[in-house]
Amino acid sequence: MSTEAKAASAPVVAAARRTWVLPLVLTVPGLGFLSVRFFEATHEGIANARSNACRALSPDPVPAALLNREAPDFQLPDASGKMVSLSSQRGHPVLVNFWATWCPPCVEEVPSMEDLARRLEKTDIRMMAVSVDDSWDAVRQFFVKGTKMGVLLDLSKNVPKSFGTEKYPESFMIDASGHVRHYFINKRDWSKPEAIACLESLR
């Protein structure tokens, strides 16, 4: 190519390069914006799904005395005699369930509670199944094959009273900061996938 031809083609090449560079410059920030919006939309979608999961479990209104307040702390023995407190679970979502072996709806609820407990084993979510039976013998006879439910025994029956519980079963979902967020009167099917999704929203 002659010197004159090269000189003539130079503006064309430069213009072509500018044509490619301009969309690229405009596209990079655009991709960043789209990435942020995608993240926000995904995060919002997950939050909505978990909120819907909680509603699917049909929670009852949180008692006024507990609404937006820290759950009453308690310390009770497990089957080995070790004392376990609610406050020691801080930083984890917790499902507190008040029940008894002599309570028919509680007994009906236990299989789904067991199913949930097994699925929670490898998560940071805790379950505290507080029995108001009169002795460990009754609880041990009930769970002949053992249990994953994290059973504690309250011989005084004062802990349920501190939560305002008068009938069994009743359950409270407590968030990682120790506040009661959801309340359930009577039995629920805790084997539903919504149960874990709802608890996950309390991290």
Enumerate the predicted regions with their spans.
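Short, internal strand/loop/helix patches
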Residues: 128-130, 140-177, 185
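A structural alpha-helix within SAM-dependent methyltransferase catalytic domains
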Residues: 114-118, 200
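Conserved redox-active cysteine motifs that mediate thiol-disulfide chemistry
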Residues: 90, 98-115
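A short beta-strand-turn-helix
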Residues: 65-68, 73-94
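N-terminal targeting signals for export/organelle localization
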Residues: 1-70
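Thiol-/selenol-based redox modules, centered on thioredoxin-like
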Residues: 49-52, 173-203
